């Protein structure tokens, strides 16, 4: 026998124990999960990255929405500025319109000498009203309509058989709106039921 083939009992035991240890080492990874701390850290960083991306996405959406709101508000402000830029000017024209109407009411229409003057005042008033209507100025001065506190100012209440209660009976001073916004309420007498 050669020296390789002859094993002492001690050598055989040590070889067997080495083989058992090798088999146990191979079996160990299958039964016990060894967690690498680097894998845990990677998972934590991936979760943090996902949260940061979500926060960034949310803030981008919020910023876009805010920009859209600012744009829409500024468009509305510009539109209102264009629409109501003439409000003060129209308000200053109202006394002129009132005076022309008073001149027509007080004029002696029977006097033939004043006929051309009266006609001139009528044409002037008509052209002025046509011009301001083009820019959205409307007259509030109808009678026999329901009293509307948004455009009428009740100066007095009168008993009437001819009118239903809360109807405009008489307009003392015409009111005006500019593009739907009240510039001056119509001063009116409102009907009430007889007591």
From Swiss-Prot:
Pfam families membership: GrpE
Disulfide bonds: none
Superkingdom, taxonomy of origin: Bacteria
Region (Disordered): 1-40
Oligomeric and partner information: Homodimer.
HAMAP family reported for this sequence: GrpE
Primary role: Participates actively in the response to hyperosmotic and heat shock by preventing the aggregation of stress-denatured proteins, in association with DnaK and GrpE. It is the nucleotide exchange factor for DnaK and may function as a thermosensor. Unfolded proteins bind initially to DnaJ; upon interaction with the DnaJ-bound protein, DnaK hydrolyzes its bound ATP, resulting in the formation of a stable complex. GrpE releases ADP from DnaK; ATP binding to DnaK triggers the release of the substrate protein, thus completing the reaction cycle.
Family: Belongs to the GrpE family.
Protein name: Protein GrpE
Naturally occurring in which organism (per UniProt): Sodalis glossinidius (strain morsitans)
């Amino acid at each position: 026998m050669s020296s390789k083939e002859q094993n002492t009992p001690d050598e055989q035991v040590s070889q067997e124990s080495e083989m058992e240890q090798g088999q146990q080492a191979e079996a160990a990874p299958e039964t016990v999960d060894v967690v690498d701390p680097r894998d845990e850290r990677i998972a934590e960083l991936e979760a943090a990255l996902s949260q940061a991306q979500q926060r960034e996405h949310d803030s981008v959406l919020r910023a876009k929405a805010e920009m859209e709101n600012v744009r829409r508000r500024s468009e509305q402000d510009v539109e209102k500025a264009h629409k109501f830029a003439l409000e003060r000017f129209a308000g200053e024209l109202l006394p002129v319109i009132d005076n022309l109407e008073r001149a027509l009411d007080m004029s002696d229409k029977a006097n033939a000498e004043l006929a051309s003057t009266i006609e001139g005042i009528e044409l002037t008033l008509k052209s002025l009203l046509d011009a301001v209507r083009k820019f959205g100025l409307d007259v509030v001065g109808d009678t026999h309509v329901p009293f509307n506190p948004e455009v009428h100012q009740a100066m007095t209440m009168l008993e009437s058989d001819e009118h239903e209660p809360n109807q405009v009976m008489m307009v003392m001073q015409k009111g005006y709106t500019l593009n739907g916004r009240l510039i001056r309420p119509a001063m009116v007498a409102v009907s009430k039921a007889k007591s």
